[in-house]
């Protein structure tokens, strides 16, 4: 499946409030088409990122400006979500401490943490999907213009907050520790998964369905090429997702 289609599918299936936060891939392609092809007129050359404001057309400037705006959009959203997750984790800790004597409350908290964990997986997917889109649209730009902007721009991207998922990984591990704390010690992982799958309300969760869709897209992106390069995504940090990927067909069937 082409990347543009995968991105559109993911946007359609993600949380409604996230839909305008993804890469404006279609708009970037439209702006790229307005740029005249120059590959036949000039040799390919590698430029520094700050050199792209010299001797380029208005259409190229508009394209590059949108790229910069997209980076700002990604960073603002990503940092905002990380800050929100820090607060929510603290709230979960407080609620767990107060609900230890109430099985009903603990079950409710458990479901909420599962959704919360899924949302953080969505944010990991958000980072990977937008990074991949930038790599692909910049490859098209280089091919059309004869310039080599992809490498310097991606080197800049690698330093951006939305690409740095270390804190997100830490938050995910903390949420998993909470789930281990809530689940009965004598309950095996397979029993826990089966119990959650059997709960109708849980399976109707928008977070659950969005997470499944995100995992499928993330799997497609990472399995699309076996060639490792400077533009490749880093190894996936969220432990346990490989096992979750294996369960995607079953999860999708149960979630319908």
From Swiss-Prot:
Q: Which GO terms describe its cellular component?
A: nucleus
Please tell me the species this chain comes from: Arabidopsis thaliana (Mouse-ear cress)
InterPro entries, alphabetized: SPX_dom, SPX_prot
> What is this protein identified as?
SPX domain-containing protein 1
Positions occupied by motif Bipartite nuclear localization signal? 30-46
Give start and end of each SPX domain. 1-155
- Key words of the record: Nucleus
Biological process GO terms, please?
A: cellular response to hypoxia; cellular response to phosphate starvation; positive regulation of cellular response to phosphate starvation
Tell me which Pfam families the record gives. SPX
Name the job this protein performs. Plays a positive role in plant adaptation to phosphate starvation. Inhibits PHR1 DNA-binding activity in a Pi-dependent manner.
């Amino acid at each position: 499946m082409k990347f543009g289609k995968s991105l559109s599918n993911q946007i359609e299936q993600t949380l409604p409030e996230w839909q305008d936060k993804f890469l404006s891939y279609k708009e970037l392609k439209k702006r790229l088409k307005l740029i005249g092809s120059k590959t036949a007129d000039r040799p390919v050359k590698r430029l520094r990122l700050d050199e792209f404001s010299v001797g380029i057309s208005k259409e190229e400037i508009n394209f590059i400006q949108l790229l910069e705006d997209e980076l700002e959009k990604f960073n603002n959203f990503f940092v905002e979500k990380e800050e929100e997750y820090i607060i929510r984790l603290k709230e979960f800790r407080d609620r767990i401490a107060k609900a230890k004597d109430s099985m009903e409350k603990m079950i409710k908290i458990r479901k909420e943490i599962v959704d919360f964990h899924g949302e953080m997986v969505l944010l990991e997917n958000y980072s990977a999907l937008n990074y991949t889109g930038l790599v692909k649209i910049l490859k098209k730009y280089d091919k059309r213009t004869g310039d080599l902007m992809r490498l310097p721009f991606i080197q800049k991207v690698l330093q951006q907050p939305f690409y740095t998922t270390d804190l997100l990984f830490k938050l995910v591990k903390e949420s998993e520790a909470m789930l281990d704390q809530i689940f009965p010690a004598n309950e095996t992982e397979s029993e826990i998964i089966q119990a959650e799958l059997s709960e109708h309300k849980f399976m109707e969760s928008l977070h659950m369905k969005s997470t499944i869709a995100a995992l499928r897209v993330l799997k497609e992106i990472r399995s699309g090429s076996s060639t490792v390069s400077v533009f490749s995504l880093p190894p996936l940090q969220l432990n346990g997702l490989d096992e979750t990927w294996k369960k995607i067909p079953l999860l999708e069937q149960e979630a319908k």
